[in-house]
Structure formats: C-alpha cells, structure tokens
C-alpha cells in the first residue's frame, strides 16, 4: 500500500510539474517577437531528406492524424488561432509560417525539462521521457510537414501579387 501511495504521489507531482512547465514555456514562447521568426534560422530550414514535408507524411502519415491534435489556442489565448485564417493571402500565410516556427521552437524547448528526472528512479525517468516525447514530437512533425507547404503557397501568391484578397 505504501508503494502504491508513493507512485500516486510521484505521478501527481510529475503531472503538476509538466502542466506548470509546459504552460509557462508556451506563454513565454508567445512573447517572442515575430521578427525573430522572420529570419532564416537553420533549425527551421527544411532539409533535403524532408522533401518539402513529404517525408513526414510518408513515414508518419501526418495527414491522417494532424487534425486530431488539440489546438493550442484552446489552452492559451496568446497562441495564434488558426480559425482566423479566413482568407488565403500573403499576410495570412506569412503569419502561419511564423506560427509554425514558434510552435516548433516551443515544443523543442518543452522536451528539455525532462532532464530534471535524470537522477530519479528509472521507471519515473522513462515514463517522463516517454511523456515528453509523445506530447511534443508529433507537434514538431506537423510543423515540419506544414511549413514547406505553406512556403510553397507563399511563393505562388507572391508571384501572383496577391497581398490582400
């Protein structure tokens, strides 16, 4: 019984830890100025193996499950609400590209707090590593899938000169 109480207590504290840490990281991430994401950073570059996002769909079937991911705006009002994408124009697509970069960065950073469990019991460490990966990697994959497609759409719109609808 004591062992069960200990596991329940540990699970509760780990859950509270992740809730507080991830909400704070998301909140801080929404405060990063857009100009940071307009610059070309290597971490947001689409690499050759990604084949403009096709890699992610081929190996992870992103199109089948990406719509099931909870919209971050429902948890944090500072997160860009994708429902505002009513029209497809240069300004909106540029904003969406910025937000894919922001979301990817936030989720990469959200994995890092798992290091606090490094000295803990093996089972606690593995459960928390698993949680950190399962909670963040799918969102990173979706951003890496969507961004090259949005970038291609942006190029097409710029060629047509469609600044506003």
UniProtKB/Swiss-Prot annotation:
Q: Which GO terms describe its biological process?
A: carotenoid biosynthetic process
**Location within or outside the cell:** Cell membrane
Q: In which pathway does it act?
A: Carotenoid biosynthesis; staphyloxanthin biosynthesis; staphyloxanthin from farnesyl diphosphate: step 5/5
Q: Does the keyword Membrane apply?
A: yes
Q: What is its EC number?
A: 2.3.1.-
Molecular function GO terms recorded: acyltransferase activity
**Function of the molecule:** Catalyzes the acylation of glycosyl-4,4'-diaponeurosporenoate, i.e. the esterification of glucose at the C6'' position with the carboxyl group of the C(15) fatty acid 12-methyltetradecanoic acid, to yield staphyloxanthin. This is the last step in the biosynthesis of this orange pigment, present in most staphylococci strains.
Family, as annotated: Belongs to the acyltransferase CrtO family.
Q: What is this protein called?
A: Glycosyl-4,4'-diaponeurosporenoate acyltransferase
Tell me the lineage of the source organism: Bacteria, Bacillati, Bacillota, Bacilli, Bacillales
